[in-house]
Amino acid sequence: SVDMVMKGIKLWPL
């Protein structure tokens, strides 16, 4: 889901 992706990006900003 988008929520999971957004959370992942926030936790691991490349």
From Swiss-Prot:
GO terms for molecular function: toxin activity. It comes from the Eukaryota. GO terms for biological process: chemotaxis; positive regulation of mast cell degranulation. Keywords: Acetylation, Chemotaxis, Mast cell degranulation, Secreted, Toxin. It is found in: Secreted. GO terms for cellular component: extracellular region. The modification N-acetylserine is found at residue 1. Venom component which lacks hemolytic or antibiotic properties, but produces an inflammatory response via mast cell degranulation and produces a chemotactic effect on leukocytes. It comes from Polybia paulista. This is Polybine-2. Expressed by the venom gland.
